[in-house]
């Protein structure tokens, strides 16, 4: 065979595939080796390598980039003149650079072909040996546009290539994309690996177990297209499939049912027919497997698939492996960069254009801001050549196409005639926004712009441009006024540099004594103060901490409770008297006599309002909280001081013990000191519980009480006794004395003092649980601030200061109320606010009245000019404007101008005969001079605003440079599929709802589309039986159907991704009434299956990856095989159970024979994770996810695992039922321990090697001839078998081993009798079902 052509990568692939198909792998690999040697030999001879000289930049590049830049300069000027909006400018820039980059790429290729076809770079890239076009483009073309981290395209392209070298800016821009690529790759590997794992899990039990299931069902295959482009031709999709019925063309049978299509037949059928019915794993009726005929070829060999082939795992790997190559991320290009699918039509020759009748057009504004004619209904244009030898050409135009020529226009060769939009591609658009910021400071003026206020439901008002127009910024210097500043000039004033424009006053609210530290930013004003003039403060340190002690004139000592230099609130405690008059030695009980206290808190203590006596009955309380077994004494026992009451706890005083316990936990031990008398009775002695016994009371003739006691009857281990407990008395004065204090300048009606307060910490009758002792009463100095206006007191604080006393080493305590005022910092060069100067108007030590001005901040003018833009009243704005000479320019004219004062002039507009304005501006005045005229203009800048834009500013507002002016709202084509690549594959296979699902028609009918004013669209469908269904649309959804259009069931009415669950539901509900549940479920599942297969294919195709349909079909089959039981009827099935559709239908058929009620069900679509967890085998499900849940459920339900898949068998450690282990699986499919006697040792029934024709099939002719290089895969069993040329007699012990392996394969002792007869897998299934029912 002789080919005379250049062999590149593609041709090489085909050559090797042909050799493999025809001559097997051994010869093919030998040929591949020889080809490799050939390649290397000639590459070495030729010296193919890349050097810098090979990277030739096409000479036309410079000129191409210059023309692109020229086009962009024009666009920029149009933008500056206000002819196009920011969005249109951006779009034009992006499109210009894109087309330049593309045409440069073509130029690179042309340049190589013409000048140096043997260039190493060119040869490598185009033969497919190394590199690709996009890399070559970056080496010698231009790198093109890049996206920023948010995915928006940066409108600064990288014009250089790697051969010329990048500038710093370009390098930084391009590093965004590079980093993104690396991160993406890292994320992709993990994602794709997990996807493969889930796919394997869901399909691992799909094994070819039958030769032919005999089904009559089929799927229809057509070529896969995207718009006009054919992604996968029909011939490619047919290869290796079995036909479902004979193909007859013009009465001739081209191919028959069940024929597997090879290359030739596929080519032939692809030419002759558009759609073809084939068998598919989706429709295969083999139970829990796929049959050979439905699967077709094993694509690895180009022969029918072998029995026992694990096609599920092959499918999973075929889909999972390319996952890494899919792009992960959505490059959302900030959208303006559209994937507009418009075909450009250029004139092939010079000629005249004619519009044919029936072509209806209307004028539109294109996305570049140009006015063009757009085609409304399909029509045609005709091009008549100037050269009569050529033929007239007619072009058909689709609606939405743009015309670049007029009727009757003469066109030159290669002139652009029209951009034809593809009618197949549904143009889905979405709303997007873009901010426009101001390029100069000044005031705002609207021209032809009509604003309109809209209020939404929340009551927020937005201002929207009702009609588009120009928004002008008239130049001027804008000053931002600080808060509180009042302008001291008015509109129209002329100001010079350094004049004060506005000022802020700093006012003291309270007045008082001024304290001003040098170089400080704060002015402190003392409004009131108090000092302890007779007391000294000394610093003493105890336990390593400094303490401030106040010694008063009358010998009292106070401890300062706050640190000097800090602020204290009103009513805060400043100091506490040091005294131990009210200190107890242990805990005890407290009783008030004549004492009255004010309300207060436990933490602060209760203030004593009236003096009296405190009675204190001491007792020692140990809080223990230990086990009762540690107790060393008994309840009621008398203990001596120092005795151990609980392990490691000793009492300090003698007395009677009271034990408090709860639930065998020892809570408290109380030791009550006192005198214990045992020989008294309560009745005879007349002493009540808790009675006070006064001194001199005679208890018995021998005993007289010396001091005050409290009586308590206690139970001891010797009987009832009387305990007389000691009582301490503490006398409390009505009020304590305050140290003398002098106060100064109590201005503004304020008064400040330190008040002495006695506070008691325990309530009347309270028990103090303690061993040590406590302070009962404390005397405190409290800060009291009072004022004529009580509400102004709450926020006042006082500062604690220590003033040194002359010629003594101690200090005096002083409390002052300060008002602190902070001065503004001066700034000479605030770019937005003028020069700011602050002047202080007071001196240190001044006395000032309330309301006095302490300092004044002035905003000074930086440039001479006229004041504008001050507003009064409610409209007051914190800005003012100065129009200086820099903002104006003068044009001398020789002729009379055509403009008058206040006119707005756009750059390059005519202002007098033959005179164009150099800049845009507003005419201030037109003056006549000796030589002619003089126009004075104020610089200005127009911005084009499209209708519907959101305005951030109003007419007359003052804006700084960089302020937002408007938010342009525009429609952009959704860039491709917003979710691409892996995430989309995952969304499909996990059967997730898409984010913005489209609306599907539930019944066929005729559409009625109504557009309401507020951009809301109503779609109603008049169904065939006359019912009208309404389909509500969300705001973001655009209708895809037009008024009076006929629609079919399940058709998408709006843009967006279809939700597969909804497809299933819509079709099932539509068919169920006419066809019954089973057929409806099959039909609905088929629609969903085809949708999923096509969607997955299109994602892989968009990345240029080819996957055979059958792999996806195997996976989708696993996702769509189950139904959910709605009502079990008379069967044993439970509502909500997920079961195989065929299994349910078998039971229902049995029910219809016996007359029982059939089960009702709905088909369900399970994502791959869900399907893996709902598989028949609980071992497989448990080893995938949620192990504990799966195993506990299986245990509760008493499930059996039939060990059909690969995974279950691997886990349990047996042969897998695929490949070489398939036969043993088949023959033992129902074997119990019972074996028929005549077969006992006849192992010839079971061959231990696989003939090359595939297991279970007759061997290939010529098998065993050495003449043919057969492809064989040997394992040790097969090898032994081959060695003798026949099946070997195995040793007895090996036989025993094998037979034990064989019989244990399905050893089910408890129900063995049921299985002894069952030999076929199908029967086994029926048994399993019957068994489950019973």
From Swiss-Prot:
Disordered as annotated region, ranges: 1299-1334
Listed EC numbers: 2.7.7.6
Keyword Transferase attributed: yes
Cofactor annotation remark: Binds 1 Zn(2+) ion per subunit.
Cofactor(s), by name: Zn(2+)
UniProt KW Transferase keyword: yes
Protein keywords: DNA-directed RNA polymerase, Metal-binding, Nucleotidyltransferase, Transcription, Transferase, Zinc
GO MF term set: DNA binding; DNA-directed RNA polymerase activity; pentosyltransferase activity; zinc ion binding
Domain of life: Bacteria
Protein's job: DNA-dependent RNA polymerase catalyzes the transcription of DNA into RNA using the four ribonucleoside triphosphates as substrates.
Family: Belongs to the RNA polymerase beta' chain family. RpoC2 subfamily.
Quaternary data: In cyanobacteria the RNAP catalytic core is composed of 2 alpha, 1 beta, 1 beta', 1 gamma and 1 omega subunit. When a sigma factor is associated with the core the holoenzyme is formed, which can initiate transcription.
Protein's name according to its UniProt entry: DNA-directed RNA polymerase subunit beta'
